[in-house]
Amino acid sequence: MPQLWQGRASKAVDSRVNDFNSSIRFDARMIEQDIQGSLVHSAMLGRQGIISRQDVDDIHKGLHSILDDLHSGALEIDPNAEDVHTFVEQTLTARVGDAGKRLHTGRSLNDQVALDIRLNLRAASEHIQGQIKELITVLCDQAEKGAGYVMPGYTHLQRAQPVTFGHQLMAYAWMLLRDLGRLQDATRRMDAECPLGSGALAGTTYPLDRFYTAEQLGFAAPCGNSIDGVSDRDFCIELCSAMATCMMHLSRLSEEIILWCSWEFKFIELDDAFTTGSSIMPQKKNPDVTELIRGKTGRVYGNLNTLLVMMKGIPLAYDKDMQEDKEAIFDAVDTLELCLRTVTPMLATMTPLPANMRRAAAKGFINATDCADYLTKKGMPFRDAYKCTGTMVAACIREGKTLEELTLDEFKQYSDLFEDDVYTAINLTTCCEGRTSYGGPTKASVMKQVADVKGKLA
């Protein structure tokens, strides 16, 4: 398939250069967006009297026939085409004749590509946003069921204070809600400016109606500077950054799932459908999904770094380096979509094991802070209460006891402020339900968080 750009060249391009230059293997995914942009561009050309009404009708008929063949599976994309834009235009011309040759009037591949990427990423972002909403809903549903399941909360991976399973899951729901907001913000900025009509970099002499094409394509307005319109990929970087942040949260959640389903924790049981076995060890039930999410997170980070490094030294306006944007951003999109598609049903079918959580919470003196708070509320300065409780914990460790196993007389050896009500104060359920500060682990707080988060998804 010949190139559209062979103007002054007197020699055919070396086949090795053609192979090196080709992007059809990864930009073919933009074919629908390319056709969408061409339909609007040609309609505008007709409205402005730049091409005839008959040409517009022929172009639209041809583009719709290509689209129909694409949807039916009858369209064969030529792997030897330089890119998807060349393929569409040359296929169109083969079907409708000279009208197809007029489609590119007033347009450059530079603004065409910048438009197609935006349209493609808009659709991808909207799909991912829907996936994140589904995942948040699953987390909320599991949190609602586990709002009363007491478990250890950790710092430094050491048992720290009692929380609930629902409280822990809602932490991730809030994180993902911010990820959703970041994707929405990035998409809103991407949709603010339409590059179509920027030409190669300096606009065009044709009387284009850029406001019409921007509106028809769902943009707020045309970009205000034609050079900027074709020469930046900050929208790719911003969207990839939002996706990388989301992957980071999925990776942290995955790490917790990996720990929780191990025999050392056994806080949850994953459904067999979302685990794998071993080729040699018949007892194994491996959380491969979550391990792969951890691994794939680095892949998305790498894509973000590719985009940043690619753009850092490019002079205005368009440079061929920018062709590398597509593989990076599309791979980031595909990776996040795949992770979300898999992790959501895995979490929906996950079974909590509250008895094991409670047993773990009963060890490790995670009610020590509540013991210190008890003394503080009785009038002892907090620092003194902290030291007193630390001394008690050290003694209990030596004697193989828990705080709850101390008699009242033993408590009073450390302070006369201790009374019978200390046992209620350091009870694990009381420890959780007593933390009534906003956003805390009480059952009422978790249920409110569930309602608040679901309300933000509506």
Predicted features by range, described:
Residues 1-37, 98-99, 281-458:
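Glycine-rich cofactor/substrate-binding loops
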Residues 1-189, 193, 199, 203, ...:
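A helix-coil-helix interface module used to build multimeric assemblies
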Residues 38, 85, 89, 236-239, ...:
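Short runs of predominantly hydrophobic/aromatic residues within well-ordered alpha helices
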Residues 117, 122-124, 129, 144, ...:
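Charged, flexible cofactor/metal-binding loops and thiol motifs
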